Amino acid sequence: MHFTQREQDKLMIVVAAEVARRRKARGLKLNHPEALALISDELLEGARDGKTVAELMSYGKTILNEEDVMDGVANMITELEIEATFPDGTKLITVHHPIV
């Protein structure tokens, strides 16, 4: 089985997001890469489910809060951009200040 670079990148997001979900469920605070992966995965899945870019931009701000992440992580992530596949093509989702 051969994956394109884009497919490999998406698989890495899924794996990192699953690690982040398990750690969050155990009550651990997420670090920078874990927080990015979790939010990104939720956005990618939302696009797959048929949500609009506008809906996902709003939803992206509700996934994590400052209590879910290590000190300073929320301030490090001022913007998240990810390309997602929608029923009508690939679009860029941008979430400003995703961790409030």
From Swiss-Prot:
Pathway: Nitrogen metabolism; urea degradation; CO(2) and NH(3) from urea (urease route): step 1/1. Pfam families: Urease_gamma. One of its GO terms (cellular component) is cytoplasm. GO terms for molecular function: nickel cation binding; urease activity. Keywords: Cytoplasm, Hydrolase. GO terms for biological process: urea catabolic process. It is found in: Cytoplasm. It comes from the Bacteria. Its EC number is 3.5.1.5. Belongs to the urease gamma subunit family. HAMAP family: Urease_gamma. Heterotrimer of UreA (gamma), UreB (beta) and UreC (alpha) subunits. Three heterotrimers associate to form the active enzyme. NCBIfam families: PRK13241.1, urease_gam. This is Urease subunit gamma.
